[in-house]
């Protein structure tokens, strides 16, 4: 760059991301989602009022990365805890951040009942189709034919059941907002960030 040229920063780390490394597996989308959540919260001017909830699965590592007052919950319970926080702190922006195993397996009741009550929280679920933290076993969201540690020949719906689809499960309910995005491309990441904001 020439000295006379003016440099313009077009992308920087959000102030609410503090940890330079990651504990996430290679290829995992948690790091991407952590960043777009931080960018979205800052863009909304809600950094001091944002309270995310996470559980003991992979999303818990976000506590090492975010500079937010984050609440650690039992596995599958971030939505229920987020609902309680929002009722106690109605001025806060409260989000439940969890994986598909937590939201659609052990936390199915919390997910469905928060939707039935139309709780005023943001729920962000990362669906990778497996139980990632415990070794990649089949999850309720594992697709037919998808190979996992516990479905080595691929998921067979005849013997292992169908796939859990959150949109089909709660899409008919009177909820404020429901969206699905993929973090597999720059366009998908931009779309997801717009959904979050």
Language-model segments: which ranges?
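Short, Lys/Arg-enriched N-terminal segments with co-localized hydrophobic residues
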Residues: 1-8
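Electropositive phosphate-/nucleotide-binding environments in soluble metabolic enzymes
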Residues: 15, 22, 27-34, 72-75, ...
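Structural signal for hydrophobic packing residues in well-ordered secondary-structure cores
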Residues: 41-48, 60, 89, 161, ...
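Glycine-rich ThDP/TPP pyrophosphate-binding loop and its adjacent helix/strand module
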Residues: 106-117, 126, 130-197
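Active-site diphosphate/adenylate-binding microenvironment
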Residues: 8-74
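Thiamine diphosphate
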Residues: 58-132, 194
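General beta-strand structural signal in soluble alpha/beta enzymes
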Residues: 51-55, 96, 123-126, 178-182
